[in-house]
Amino acid sequence: MLHYSNCNKICEKTVMNQRTIKTAIAVTGTGLHSGQPVDLEFQPQPIDTGIVFERSDIVGSTPIPASAFLVQDTMMSSNLVFGGTRVGTVEHLLSAIAGLGVDNLLIRVSASEIPIMDGSAAPFVGLLLQAGLCEQDALKKFIRIVRTVRVKVDDKWAELRPYSGFELNFEIDFDHPAIDKDFQHAQLQFSTQNFIEQLSSARTFGFLRDIEAMRQNNLALGGSMDNAIVIDEANILNEEGLRFNDEFVRHKILDALGDLYLIGYPILGRFNAYKSGHALNNLLVREILSDHNNFEIVTFDDNVTCPIEYLPLNGITVEG
């Protein structure tokens, strides 16, 4: 479990520098679509490296930067392709990385997809914290939205607006008896603590009829109620039920946070979305980056002037 220090906020003035992990760490999970074991390893990286993926099962494979422009497939997940090499289902892991404020990291994976773990970002958060976070000798860079950008497809839309911090608002619209109409909108005022407590453990979800159809096409072979909320025509099938009343929409925010981190920096802006998904999230990021008048890259000399609250490196520990 995660344990917070008594100080809920950054209490002392400290430099707002880039972060990586202290030491390499590895885990094995299950591929959502293959159903096969997948080895995952995180390694520290130098300043200004960014987040980079590498296929450990392919000798001499080309490293894949975590870039919105390398997303070539958004069917049910965000998938990166570079130099003919693919790494899929990256959004939950990227959400954890964004939530902890990690700037530089090498992710080595032994298959074409990141393991699904429990269907949320929480296992990745725990793993990164076990490795330990450390600050580096360079200021952390942020992308500040200076002009509202909106993308729309049919009735679905997503936008980023200028805002002093980072806020995410999301609304879904499911006409299903198991998805309460009163819990289809959620908001997150981003901070590391809010991310861990309110968002990181929200699981992905799927409808039983869709899962059965995918399995007929050799997809979702690793999917189960251990790593997803499964819904039939009327009910949630997981015996333990939901972790939050609004877990469905919280997970959509979790996905969006990971998709948005493909912009390359932590965001200063307000994200609003209605029925958005991986494709629209990616389109939004590309649209923002297409015009330098939409944004500016900024740094902060200290955490007091930085409008985003990251917990200090000693503010979270892993127990058990």
From Swiss-Prot:
Enzyme class: hydrolase
Origin: domain of life: Bacteria
GO biological process: lipid A biosynthetic process
Binding site for Zn(2+): H92, H251, D255
Record bears the keyword Isomerase: no
Role according to the record: Catalyzes the hydrolysis of UDP-3-O-myristoyl-N-acetylglucosamine to form UDP-3-O-myristoylglucosamine and acetate, the committed step in lipid A biosynthesis.
PANTHER family attached to this UniProt entry: UDP-3-O-ACYL-N-ACETYLGLUCOSAMINE DEACETYLASE 1, MITOCHONDRIAL-RELATED
Protein name, as recorded: UDP-3-O-acyl-N-acetylglucosamine deacetylase
Organism: Psychrobacter arcticus (strain DSM 17307 / VKM B-2377 / 273-4)
